[in-house]
């Protein structure tokens, strides 16, 4: 079984158009999350880093601890930034990856407004800034939850299932759906390329002590020698972050 870092280092050997990143500035917001952090690690493992990578995070100290190994890298900068606010910078970002969003169930209950604004407001702020600063493409990390409730069969990309609009839990999938529509609207109206990905249940290293998603709870149970308690017979579409 390969380790996380072995997987990350292997990405550089994939046949991907890395040359398109030459002489560009790349911004990843939500850089300390599971997906954002893996993307930072992938880009910083590339042998020829002729681009500048900016890691945006709300907690500057936590980000500095996460990326301590890159602190002396000339091509790497940490930015203190909360995506719910307009961008306070004055530099060009040619590629932006929006991976900033609460994903833990406790946030859906305790801060549903924050969940919504991080997604919808975040997309709006990033595109609004990018229009004035030579943005070429924005990648929005959405979620498989946009498909709503299923019937046990695999989803198709064009599927759109129902969910309870009036539950606090709906803050997450409804925000993701609206943010996706906002992405394609900006792309059409301002001719800025956009892509959307819909990962389902991501798991991997570096989850925080506050993460109360099922996989994180299961891992804590195992480490503590406790029984794993399943609260439903449901199935999860799990994918490791390095995949």
Regions found by a protein language model. Name each.
Residues 1-27, 41:
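Non-catalytic terminal and boundary segments that flank Rossmann-like NAD(P)-dependent oxidoreductase
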Residues 167-195, 223-224:
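Active-site Tyr-X1-5-Lys
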Residues 27-45:
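N-terminal Rossmann NAD(P)H-binding glycine-rich loop of SDR-like oxidoreductase domains
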Residues 114-125, 166, 170, 174:
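Glycine-rich NAD(P)-binding loop of the Rossmann-fold in SDR/ketoreductase-type enzymes
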Residues 146-148, 170-171, 195-213:
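Flexible, glycine-rich beta-alpha linker
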Residues 98, 124-169:
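Conserved Rossmann-fold NAD(P)-dependent oxidoreductase catalytic core, especially the SDR/UDP-sugar
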Residues 80-118:
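NAD(P)H-binding glycine-rich loop region in Rossmannoid oxidoreductase-like domains
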Residues 239-243:
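Conserved small/polar residues in nucleotide/adenosyl-binding loops
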């Amino acid at each position: 079984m390969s380790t996380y870092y072995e997987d990350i280092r292997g990405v550089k050997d994939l046949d991907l158009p890395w040359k398109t990143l030459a002489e560009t500035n790349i911004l990843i917001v939500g850089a300390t999350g599971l997906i954002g952090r893996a993307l930072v690690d992938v880009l910083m493992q590339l042998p020829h880093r002729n681009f500048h990578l900016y890691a945006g995070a709300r907690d500057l100290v936590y980000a500095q601890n996460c990326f301590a190994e890159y602190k002396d890298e000339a091509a790497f900068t940490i930015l203190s930034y909360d995506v719910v606010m307009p961008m306070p910078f004055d530099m060009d970002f040619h590629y932006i990856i929006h991976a900033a969003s609460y994903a833990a169930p406790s946030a859906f209950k305790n801060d549903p407004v924050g969940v919504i604004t991080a997604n919808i407001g975040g997309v709006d702020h990033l595109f609004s800034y990018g229009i004035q600063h030579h943005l070429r493409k924005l990648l929005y990390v959405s979620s498989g939850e946009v498909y709503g409730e299923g019937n046990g069969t695999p989803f198709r990309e064009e599927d759109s299932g129902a969910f309870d609009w009036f539950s606090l839990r709906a803050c997450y999938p409804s925000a993701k759906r609206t943010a996706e529509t906002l992405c394609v609207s900006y792309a059409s109206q301002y001719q800025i390329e956009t892509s959307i990905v819909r990962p389902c249940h991501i798991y991997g290293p570096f989850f925080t002590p506050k993460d109360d998603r099922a996989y994180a709870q299961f891992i804590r149970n195992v480490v503590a020698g406790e029984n794993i308690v399943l609260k439903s017979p449901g199935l999860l579409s799990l994918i490791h972050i390095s995949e």
